[in-house]
Amino acid sequence: MSDFKRSKANNNTEELIEKIVFINRVAKVVKGGRRFSFSAIVVVGDGNGKVGYGLGKANQVPEAIRKGVERARKDMALVSLTDVSIPHQVIGHYGAGRVFLRPASAGTGLIAGGPVRAVLEAAGVSNILTKCLGSHNPHNMVKATIDGLKQLRSAQKIAELRGKNVEEITA
């Protein structure tokens, strides 16, 4: 389901990549039968280090997607990236799901599956190795991936926090 991709202009004329991760049909049982509605997990990113996710719920699929995109745009996080990959390896956690993110050299490509791939493509990561551990629920995988990306720090940021220069940190 994650192969669906659209680019749309934001109010700020900013191009964002929208990826639908999962669409779920849910039913509410009432006296007269079942009432169906839909939920959609959507990931939005600028392809340059900003990424967010949103869950939209509605009676129709397009409306659920629209609500998910709207929520994802409101809740975007800035991710620290290097030229070709991420600065260091990290494990993102959410619930019973864990996602292991490991930097890769140029030319490796995006080695990830399903929801993790959608998040990383929207964030603009092009070379990375990933492994999903624990729960493979799309909700948990998306949130664990974004948690891992939020933990990333560049060498400059770490040096600034420690009050040292970059050469002392990388040596």
From Swiss-Prot:
GO terms for biological process, alphabetical: translation
Entry keyword Disulfide bond: no
Domain S5 DRBM: 16-79
Protein name, as recorded: Small ribosomal subunit protein uS5
UniProt keyword terms in alphabetical order: Ribonucleoprotein, Ribosomal protein, RNA-binding, rRNA-binding
GO molecular function ontology, one term from the record: structural constituent of ribosome
Keyword Ribonucleoprotein: yes
Subunit structure, as described in the record: Part of the 30S ribosomal subunit. Contacts proteins S4 and S8.
Biological role: With S4 and S12 plays an important role in translational accuracy.
Family of the protein in this entry: Belongs to the universal ribosomal protein uS5 family.
A Pfam family this chain is assigned to: Ribosomal_S5_C
Highest taxon of source: Bacteria
InterPro entries xref list: Ribosomal_Su5_D2-typ_SF, Ribosomal_uS5, Ribosomal_uS5_bac-type, Ribosomal_uS5_C, Ribosomal_uS5_N, Ribosomal_uS5_N_CS, Ribsml_uS5_D2-typ_fold_subgr
Gene Ontology, cellular component aspect: small ribosomal subunit
Entry comment, domain topic: The N-terminal domain interacts with the head of the 30S subunit; the C-terminal domain interacts with the body and contacts protein S4. The interaction surface between S4 and S5 is involved in control of translational fidelity.
